[in-house]
C-alpha cells in the first residue's frame, strides 16, 4: 500500500519528466526491416521499439507489471511462517501454514491478474502510430499480421514480468508450483481477451491527431 501511495503521489511528475515533445515521431521502414526472420517478427520488433521509444507509454503501460515485480521482490525478505506467527501462537504456525499459502496464492492470482491486465498497450497501439499510420498500409504484410503483432507484444511482456514475479514468490515458498502456473496462465488468458477488445475499439475509433503522447496513453 505504501509503494502504491508513493508512486501515485508522484505519478504526474513522472509523466511530466518522461513526456515527449508535442511532435509525433515519424516511423520509418527501417523499423520493419525485412532482414528479420519473418515479417511477423519484424512487426513485433517494430512494436517493441514503439513502446520503448515513448518513455511515458512505457511507464504507464508497464506500471502494473513493474509494481508486481517490486512487491514480489520485497516479499522474498519475509517468510510465510513469520507472517503467520503475527496472528497465531508459534505452536499453531505449522497448522495454519497451508491455509496461509492458499490465501496468499489466491491474493497473488487475482491482484496480479488485475495488475497485468492494466498493461494493455494493444488498446492504444493503433492510434499511437499517429499520422504515420499510412506507412503500415504500404507494407507487404496483411492486417492480420499487423494487429496480431500488437497483441503478441502485449502478451510477451506480460508473460516475462509474470514469470519473474512468480519466481520471486516461489523462492521463499510463499506459493506452490501449481499456484505459480495458475498465476501465469490466467493473466495471459485474460490479457489476450482485453487486448483484443481494446485493439478492436482503438481500430474502430482511432485518434491519429494527438499532439502529446500522454493524451493517447491516458485513453
Per-range role (PLM):
Residues 1-134, 142-219:
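Hydrophobic alpha-helical transmembrane segments of membrane proteins
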